[in-house]
């Protein structure tokens, strides 16, 4: 039996649709658990997906580039599933640019932000926040923010502009390396079926 970690929220419906197209059915479904004949799905916070795999509770999971880089876990990443692409960006108040000297940066991703600052040679004070990061420059808590954006609309609404793109975020299929060894046949079979469904869906999409 395969155990999967599924991220709650915007990716949940997409992932579950792919699983059902792959041929899995679920006899029991709740907000935290989906159970079928050959599969169990744990519905978890996106940031918790790698934790479930690292600790051996789940064999396969789905999570974004942002989570993988923030958590810095060693998981197998065979391919990603097509979703709306978003970006991790550095942003600040419109027209002010990047300040000289020490920079106060608010973010939900302190590890990603720290490494980014180091690559730029900046002296930064990182302010970890759990939500509403775009409020930090308005309130005077930070000079800049590092956050995820898809369309840039929320940034514009708060009079912020993108100053740098740090990386593109995709949704990765991730595999526990131990499971890949001990359940290789099951894992490989699942990945092949999933990839086939994804490729079929892509081929069915109308071309512009």
Swiss-Prot record:
InterPro entries noted in UniProt: ATP_PRibTrfase_cat, ATP_PRibTrfase_CS, ATP_PRibTrfase_HisG, ATP_PRibTrfase_HisG_short
Name the EC number(s).
2.4.2.17
A Pfam family recorded for this sequence: HisG
**Entry GO MF terms:** ATP binding; ATP phosphoribosyltransferase activity
Localized where? Cytoplasm
Offer a single GO CC term for the protein. cytoplasm
Q: Which UniProt keywords apply?
A: Amino-acid biosynthesis, ATP-binding, Cytoplasm, Glycosyltransferase, Histidine biosynthesis, Nucleotide-binding, Transferase
Substrates-to-products reaction catalysed: 1-(5-phospho-beta-D-ribosyl)-ATP + diphosphate = 5-phospho-alpha-D-ribose 1-diphosphate + ATP
Q: Please state the pathway this protein functions in, per its UniProt record.
A: Amino-acid biosynthesis; L-histidine biosynthesis; L-histidine from 5-phospho-alpha-D-ribose 1-diphosphate: step 1/9
Q: Which PROSITE patterns match?
A: ATP_P_PHORIBOSYLTR (PS01316)
What's the top EC group for this one?
transferase
According to the lineage, what is the superkingdom? Bacteria
For this chain's UniProt record, which GO biological process terms are given? L-histidine biosynthetic process
What note about domains is in the entry? Answer: Lacks the C-terminal regulatory region which is replaced by HisZ.
Q: Write out the function statement from the record.
A: Catalyzes the condensation of ATP and 5-phosphoribose 1-diphosphate to form N'-(5'-phosphoribosyl)-ATP (PR-ATP). Has a crucial role in the pathway because the rate of histidine biosynthesis seems to be controlled primarily by regulation of HisG enzymatic activity.
Instruction: Give the record's subunit note.
Output: Heteromultimer composed of HisG and HisZ subunits.
Similarity comment text for this entry = Belongs to the ATP phosphoribosyltransferase family. Short subfamily.
Quote the protein name from its UniProt record. Answer: ATP phosphoribosyltransferase
From which source organism is this entry? Thermotoga petrophila (strain ATCC BAA-488 / DSM 13995 / JCM 10881 / RKU-1)
| Gene for this chain | hisG
